[in-house]
Amino acid sequence: MQQDSNKKKGKGYRVRPAFARERLNGRTRRVCSILGLAAVVLASAVVVHSLYVIQIRDGAKYRQYAAQQQLLDTTVKATRGEIYDANGITLASTSVVWNIWADPSYSSILYTTSTNDDKTTVRTFDPTMCAEVSQGITLRLLSGDGESLDAVDTSSEEYTQQYQTVYDALSKIDSSYVVLATKVNNAVKLSIEDYVSGFNKAHKKGSGADRIGRVSVSTEKSSQRNYPYGAFAAAVLGFTDGEGVGTYGLEKSYQSTLAGVDGRTITRRNAVGNAIADQNATTFAAKDGSNLVLSLDVNVQEIAERYLTEAVAANNVENRGCAIVMNVKTGAILAMASKPDFDPNTPLDYSANLAYLQEQVAAEPELYTIYLRDENDSKKFKLDENGNKIVDPDPDYTGTYRDILWKNKAITELYYPGSVFKVITSAMGLDSGVATMNTTFTCAGAYGVAKETYHCAGHKAHGTINMADALRQSCNLYYIQLGQRVGSQQFYNYFDAFGFTERTGVDLPSETGLMKYYSANQLGEVQLASSAFGQAMAITPLQMCTAVAAAVNGGYLVTPHVVDKITDTNGNVVEEIGTNIRRQVISESTSDVIRQMMEYEVGNGTGGGKNAYVSGYRIGGKSGTSEQLNMHRRADGDYKKVASFAAVLPADDPEILVYVMLDDPNNARTDYSSILAAPVAGNIISEVAPYLGIATDGEDRSQTTVTVPNLISTEWSNAQVQLNIKGLKHQLMESASDQTAALVTCQYPYAGAKVPYGTTVYLYTDTYDGSLTEVPDVSGKSADFARQMLAAAGLNCVVEGDANGVVQSQSSEVGASVQRGTIVTITCG
């Protein structure tokens, strides 16, 4: 018992020290337990919140991320619509081309690798291998067909530039994407692919090559806009940028119509991002763009451009020229030309017109001078100590040159219309009832208005004349007095009604809205006087055309348009552009009087506009020679001039209007539009009228014989006018050099020859005395077909016998070499 008692007291036993955790009291354990539980709960809350965010709140976003990693979304490009002329001839189309690119970083043949002491890998460029690959690719790029490698001139500048482009791109061995070439055709693309494939096979392991490696070159599909006729209707068609987006002309104004809507293909992709063949791929088909069918006719456009180009060169026109052929009843534009212009296939290239552009810029220093910009604020100019702008000593006119050529002169530039506007002033006076065609005013050669004294051209005194004679003689003083009778308010009301205070609404971009005119309360005595004969209000050529059209079509102002209809890819008409009559400006009876006076102006080759006359047609017209008051003056101190002419036909019931404008002609002989612009309009009419089937004057001249005039030493344009008046056709033959402003040195048939009405006279403006052609065999052909065959050979034709029969004989031996213009008589039966 004693022993047990001692044990209880601890005697004879060693007590073991307690561990730290055993020393924790109960309260501490509870705190720790609570904290641990809180940590677990907090962690769970974080997880739950994350799950909530990922799966519920932002679930859609994360599912999209996951889908993007698993799915490949590829754009399917829509094919841009085409542009056709009125006859269905393609003016703009899209073709498939290829861009060639490379991955130099993956092209191990272009570099060698080594390891530094710090174990980093270093690449060393191999210029020899890069040169070999660059040469192989360049030869194929310049071959055109991928095969004619031997035909490539490796010493040419073109080769050097292309080679350097490829070499520089491939030498970027740390880059994964470099472009070697763009817009490559399929044949060249396949040739490059074959070359690269063969090269890589020759340099793979086991091939025995000195260097083992590969070059990574790939292709990507692209598109290219093509304009098959080059610099043709360029200002109307416009062009697209590198991405295929319309940036000018119809390409811009109808961008959404032509572009279509891109499609998409969604497929699964593998770990490296490539598409996996999958039957469950989702495709949203692209909707190809619609096509534009124009009212513009390539044949009419070609005629207008040809004669305009000749006139610009012959008359040394400094600020370009424009021509318009328009249906006066519908507003449909059959031709619209600005010359010189550009090739929409290469719109950035102005080299063909560089000399012309340099002269134009130099002639207008106030308009085109480039000044230095402030380094701190590019919107401000740098000024000298006197506060004057500092001229850039090394100006870059690239943008200026392109802007000049790209502008559609018919709608983007303002000019003073001059005497063509007298047609409108006449309509104002007639329609308002303040005058009739027989109303007279006196022209004494000078007329004072306020502090200004006005004169007619050449200070002529026309005496007392009526409205018809005033229009024919282009009497400024008559129209000043007529304008005064109309009055400022009424003058402005008609000016506004004829559409001069607003855009025409033509379906082309960049039509200027910065009209320059006087409102009724701004039309003081002087402003009204100058406006009455077209020398105070600035308008666009197309505004003048629509106003003249309204004056002769019964008084209706129509909206001009270039697009006739829109079709889908199958040719079905989606939309048809009808005639839009904006309002009636003058009465039918007033319009009838205007038509009579305009025909009197041309006068069958005897009036003031006689140089626009073409035998066999009833033509009305009016010339206008105006001063460009807002332009830099000529060296002689005189204002620069604008020569214009507006013609309508047939005069009794007009269908078409032909308008020509030459901005700042520098013809040493004259400034008068009746001599410079009227012949251009007449020449256009001489070919356009028969092509369009415009009604003739009804007189049968099939049996008429005409005497060929002597045209030697006559300016070619005047020679053509003489032929137009006599009812003879003309053909200006190509000269050995550009001599469009030269005199006629040879003609055939010769002067004095008696020829049938409608015979073609061939004109030469160089020292060559004639061009030979071979006589075709027309035996057994119908008279009409024989006539066409002979015309194609440059020969004239006289039909004898039964015109409904076939050719029995011909006067010139088959195969004989004769001068162009020779008359071949065929006998039919």
Language-model region placement:
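Sec-exported extracytoplasmic/periplasmic mature domains
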Residues: 138-146, 197, 241, 259, ...
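Ligand-recognition elements built from short beta-strands and adjacent flexible loops
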Residues: 577, 616, 630, 660-829
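Extracytoplasmic
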Residues: 76-79, 86, 93-97, 175, ...
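Acidic/histidine-enriched alpha-helical segments
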Residues: 149-161, 317-330, 442-446, 510-512, ...
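Beta-lactam-recognizing serine transpeptidase/beta-lactamase-like catalytic domain environment
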Residues: 92, 98, 270-284, 329-420, ...
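Periplasmic/cell-envelope proteins involved in peptidoglycan metabolism and beta-lactam response
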Residues: 1-392, 405, 414, 489-496, ...
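Soluble non-cytosolic domains of exported or imported proteins
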Residues: 78, 124-131, 182-186, 244-248, ...
